[in-house]
Each structure stands twice: as C-alpha cells, then as structure tokens.
C-alpha cells in the first residue's frame, strides 16, 4: 500500500466533497419536512392563502413612507398597510470600502423583498392588497436618540368605530423589533381578527459561484422540526401549511450572511404557510383569531428579525433561530469551532490572526493522530522489500498473497490502514471548520493584513493560493514514496497544481487556514521523521 498516494487521493476527495456539498446546498435544498398532524387546539388559524383574493390585485400605491433610524437599522415603513419596505443594515457595508450600507429589504421595480403584516379574519382590514388601511403618523421620521434604549413608532387608523394602533418597537443594538397591534372596539358589535406576518420576495435562483454558491430561499422551524429549508422551487410545487400546536416556531427568508424572520408570540394553533403569487413567494405565520367584544380591546403581536446571522443574538430571540447559520450535518463540531474562533478573536482583535491561532490549536489537538499516521507509513515502508519478495514468490495467487500479507502485518504489528485511518478521522474536523469559516458573517469584510482586506472574499492577487500550492508541493517532496508507476507519479505531481486552481476562488480566510495547516504539517513532519529515524524507522 502506498500511503502517500492514498492520502493525496483522500485530500482530493475532501475538496471535491466540499465543492459538491456547496453546490448541493444551493441547487438542491433538503427535502421538505413532513407536516405535522393537525393540533387538537379548538381554534387553529386557517391557512392564510384561503382568506385572500383568489387573484390578488396590484399592491396599492403608497401614500408615503416614514423613516426609522436606530444605531443598527434604517427602515422605511409604508403608511399604507404599515409594511417594512426597505431595510439598511447600518453596521454592514454593501461593498468593501463602500460607505453605502447593506440593503436587506427593498421594494424596487426589479426586486422586491419586504416584511408585511396585518389583520385578517371576518372584520380584517388587510384582506385585499388593493384596499389596505392608510395609517396616520405623527412625523415623517423617527430616530433612536443617544442615551435612549427604546423607540416606539405608533401608526393609527380608524374605521367603522374601531381604532387600530400599529406600533413598531425598536431596542438599541438589536436587529429584532416588535410589531404590536392594539385594537379598540367601539363599533357596537363584536369584531374578530387574526394577525398575519410574512416575508415576500421574488422567486429567484440561488446565485453565487461554483466554489461559493449560496442558498437564497425560505426556511422555518416548528415544535417537531428544528430547522428546515423550503426553497422557492418547493413553494412553487406546493404551498406549505403547518399548524403549530404550541405556537412555537418561525418563518424566514435567508441568504448568505443575512436573514429576515417572523416569530409569532407562542399562540397555540398558529398556521405557518407559504404561497406563490406570480413571481413572488411568501413565507409567514397566521395567528389564531380573537373576538373583541364591543367596548373592549385586544393586542396582537409578533417579532421581526432583520439583520445579519448572529448566532448568540438570534438564539436569544427565538428557539432554533440561530440554526439559519447552517453548518450542515457536522454542526455539532462546527459550532464549537466557531465559538472558539470568536473567543480567540475577542483577545487578538483580528479574524485572520484568530484563524491562524485556531489552526495551531486544531493541528496541535490532532498531533497524536498525525504522529500515528507517519509512524504507520514508516513501518509499512520498511516492509516493502518483504512484500516485494512475497509477490515474486507467490505470483498471481491473490488469495494466498492476501493471507500471507495479513500474517506478515500481524507478525510485524503493522496496521495496513494506519497511514490513512488518522487522516480519515481528521476529515470531519476539516469539513466542519470549512463550514464554520464559510458561514461566519463576522469574516465578511474583515481584513487580515496587507493586501487581504476581506477574509470572506478570494485573494485578489492569488498570493495565498499560490503559497498554499507551494507548501503542498513541499510536503509532497518531503514525504517519501514508493510509487514507481510513471502515470501515478504524474498524477501526484499534478495534484498540488489542481488544488491551487481550486483554492484560487475560495475565500481567503479558508485558504489562510489551509496554508497555515500545511506549514504546521511541514513542521510536524520534520519533527516526527527525526524521532522515527532515532528509533530506527527509516522514513526514506
């Protein structure tokens, strides 16, 4: 067995797997969850799609929008319906070195991504897209002042003796805002309403590149399904309708690094739904009806998250909301790695330096496996003369050859898989760390030093990938091999070139990790080889 060749093949398979997995995330989201059985709740919310116009008309023209500015958000709210039609993330720039903020929500001719909410039911005021309430406001703009921790933006509407107060509540430093309806019924009759809240976005392709495709689409959580993607293709195939028996869950539209989500206020019987209107897709929640007696009042409320995928903050807003940071099937490894990376960054103050420190920690922890790998390779190499003599003596009798080889391995106390098994055991860590780096919004537009101004983007001058390829070439040259077949030798020589090509388009933060990992490998390899030589295990 040529362990060096197998290690390189495993490494190539690892990169190919990562690329394929990225492509799968973007192009083929996981199959939809099986809907839960209907709750035994006596007042489940109806499917929202059943309450609207069969053929919705054009959204009625806005009378005006108001602007709300906090320390982290700048929102535009339409006074017709009270929807959030624009959202700037003040602490995140649209492009590197740009003064323009990143726009998450917007309503333009070419693209729509908005957060809508309203009241439906028998006396609903938001049943028709062409006849929504015109709210009155006290000002055209509202600002969270210095020293102020909370900002309330009330909007009022009165019809048929019923007063509606829709209030947006903002907290300092928070991307979560509350939407509250206070309804006062002075109509002389009972009135029944239920609140809905959904996100609407153009149906579109996932986008991204071959090495960094990104998922853009719906996602949700219920009491039975912690996290599930529901793509635009899924929405077009079938409308989702799930009854939340205990009212816990959320509905979101997600994309790389950012997300918007509606979280109901734990009202049993809430309906989680999707629907498609032309080229627009909705995902949201419809809460159960409440009947308000004349002379009485009631409150309806939900929480809207609109911002970056910040795990700790999202976890505090809603259970499982932090899972929109999708680490894949190795999340239980990737999440602690990300936490460790963030912990290191809090001390060193630079994400690139934190990646270097994390690499040394990970490779240090895996040193026993690395040592076992090289020791096994050295033992196998010393057996090569005996194995060659065995082949010449036995000839084409494969069964006998296999039997005598195993006896030789047992006698010499050598594991034939020892050179590959440690690397295979390390693969989950490599894959998990890959996803931890790919999914971290903290790395977006984060500089390292010199020419690396954005660890989430590819190296503009390809210096890191070239250094990574050179380090891989050095590892290959320093590693002894028994390969004599010319074709296999060419393949092994070409592999650093192939890896370099792949990494030209990878985020520089990931390439930095791989480069430092290779440097650590060179150091460990040198030290281990010297120790093995002292023990009489020849490495060449």
From Swiss-Prot:
Keywords: Cell inner membrane, Cell membrane, Chaperone, Membrane, Protein transport, Transmembrane, Transmembrane helix, Transport. CDD domains: 5TM_YidC_Alb3 (cd20070), EcYidC-like_peri (cd19961). One of its GO terms (biological process) is protein transport. The chain crosses the membrane at residues 6-26, 342-362, 417-437, 455-475, 496-516. Its main location: membrane. PANTHER family: CYTOCHROME C OXIDASE ASSEMBLY PROTEIN COX18, MITOCHONDRIAL, OXA1. Interacts with the Sec translocase complex via SecD. Specifically interacts with transmembrane segments of nascent integral membrane proteins during membrane integration. This is Membrane protein insertase YidC. The lineage of its organism: Bacteria, Pseudomonadati, Pseudomonadota, Gammaproteobacteria, Vibrionales.
